[in-house]
């Protein structure tokens, strides 16, 4: 298993996948903001955009470090749309109602993107209780639990939420790759003869398991955690997964089984 680096997302990190889905759904615009914390207890604080930056938080350019919008009110929110990342432990904390009291003033449409990946939330009951807590105590209009590594489904759900004013929440549920240990799914593979070296997989994901060895990419099998995220972004379809015929729901279950058995 790849050693954790401070400020850098691990290969297979579900927080990276969550950011990519949010970025794809939100699009660009100065009144559209992705902010908050997408790190973890091991990496420390990370701006969501840093999860796809090759050098992590330290290398992320200032123009990408969007801060939580302020100066708005419930009647006149600060921006048009805001996706505010937070860790499951932050949302479950006793001071969460105070900490997240300003969500409605951040954006006309605000989505609280909760990274549900820590050891305390490996069970369905714990996840359900967290979602209920968001509705009852944080005054969230609606909460949807999704698998961040099911990219297409995530993006569709986020786009639907971004059409509706108010405060919503998405619980991105997939266990931390470090909890899966050596039981993580098998790594992907790249056909180096067919790979055109376009860099798209690396530019979009920033995954440390993707290594450019001119003229093509290769996968560091000792680092890859078999999350399959990169397979969604290869235009020439030369990144091969052993799980190609397995449905996203089953892949998610495999990760949870690995995490619970390893823990």
Language-model regions: role of each:
Residues 1-6, 40-48, 79-80, 113-115, ...:
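Gly-rich Lys/Arg/Thr-decorated short loops/hinges at beta-loop-alpha junctions or inter-strand turns
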Residues 1-20, 142-148, 172-173:
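Phosphate/pyrophosphate-binding active-site segments
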Residues 21, 196-218, 225, 229-248, ...:
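Iron-sulfur cluster-binding cysteine motifs and their immediate structural context
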Residues 19, 32-121:
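Thiamine diphosphate
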Residues 7-8, 78, 117-157:
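Conserved thiamine diphosphate
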Residues 137-183, 228:
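Structural signature of the thiamine diphosphate
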Residues 1-16, 220-223, 238, 248-262:
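Conserved acidic/glycine
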Residues 17-18, 41-45, 90-93, 118-122, ...:
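Flexible loop/turn segments at secondary-structure boundaries
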